[in-house]
């Protein structure tokens, strides 16, 4: 049995924009034999309604510059699938008092495929059906995925 390495294969350091200036944290990626373990740990998420759910996606481009992170492109979707079946569609983050932790294993991509792309957190939940991206609202956090 293979043991999980304590060192991730890639990491994205998340920072907030104008709508969530205190947002920070990391998203780690561990390549496993059967998929990728994605582990997110964040603080400083907004505590206002509509809910404590925040959409969480991998976007095509690794450019977190500019207010509102306009240069991240669409969801990472190498197979041109409809939303919510993009490779970059991840489960929502659930915040409690501004903090969120999520660990999920996905078989939709390999770590090497997402290095250089971005992780984006949106202000609201993903409705899981609106096209092309789930109507999750503004981008409030971003981090570029870098090989460790």
Can you say where each PLM-predicted feature lies in the sequence?
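N-terminal leader/targeting pre-sequences
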Residues: 1-148
């Amino acid at each position: 049995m293979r043991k999980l390495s304590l060192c991730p294969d890639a990491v994205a350091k998340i920072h907030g924009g104008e709508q969530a200036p205190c947002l920070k944290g990391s998203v780690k990626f561990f390549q496993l034999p059967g998929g990728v373990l994605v582990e997110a740990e964040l603080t400083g998420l907004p505590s206002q309604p509509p809910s404590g759910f925040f959409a969480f996606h991998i976007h095509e481009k690794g450019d977190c510059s500019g207010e509102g992170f306009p240069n991240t492109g669409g969801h990472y979707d190498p197979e041109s699938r409809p939303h919510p079946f993009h490779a970059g569609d991840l489960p929502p983050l659930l915040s409690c008092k501004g903090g969120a932790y999520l660990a999920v294993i996905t078989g939709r991509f390999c770590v090497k495929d997402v290095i250089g792309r971005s992780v984006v957190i949106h202000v609201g939940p993903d409705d899981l059906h609106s096209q092309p991206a789930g109507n999750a609202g503004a981008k409030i956090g971003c981090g570029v995925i870098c090989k460790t």
